[in-house]
């Protein structure tokens, strides 16, 4: 299949593809406020302390495992119909626990949710690459990061509000995916293509995909390290009230959409320069958090780190997409989504291990900062080396 260059799409199409990827945020954060209630409701089930956290994280694991398959299906079968079908099934599987009373059946429904999330995330991003180019593509990809961050705050609040009606309440929100599916159906068209045999995996630019995937794993690990650990470190500064912890965490999270908006103004810069500066800024944030004298300074450091992430993620996404031909773009984006999900999983392993070795989570931050700074310096070195090399 080949696509004509310069496919025209406007604001309506961009918006229709901007909202569905919030499903990945929805999949995790909606249930965070009701996790204690679920543990109580299934307290007679052996291993419930293990099973309930698995309910929250299982969709993320499915994204890591199935995103490359989702990309392959998108390349072979087309993007739009597969996306709409995944969104419809996502709504059904997401709301299913409202009618289920067996935790293992709920676990099964969460697997379906995760597979659908892999399809939705991969195909929406791929379609943005298909339908937009140049600055428009960069801005819509940056907007995905910003909207996902803002939606995280919304879904946490909605989860807590509906959780007052019982642990099943938040599952109702999964039905919001259906109006989004209708918008995709009405507004988005499959990109024009000429049918021919779809090339194999070898058609992917292997070196480029490997480099962007490894860098994305590192970036996602840093991003989620801040997101996950802000609320766990704040009690060390005497902030123990859940409402205040939520407020402080929300302030830090605002940094991500701010960074994504800044990306709009710098997106045309050399990617090596951007990555160098962004990883260096992330290192500054971790140093600031490690040496913060009080909660306000700690949150200021976290805000800087989230802003760096808001710059870093769309940089990586546009870089990953830059060399992908239409015929393999789905698989390339699937591998990128998989790498991002692996980074999320890695953050839950790396930080506790470093905390054990250093004595606390905060004491581990300088080591993380050093790693981030090293990646940034390597990126800048590659930039300067290319500029100093003789033509």
Regions found by a protein language model. Name each.
Residues 66-78, 258-271:
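Helix-to-loop junctions at the C-terminal end of transmembrane segments
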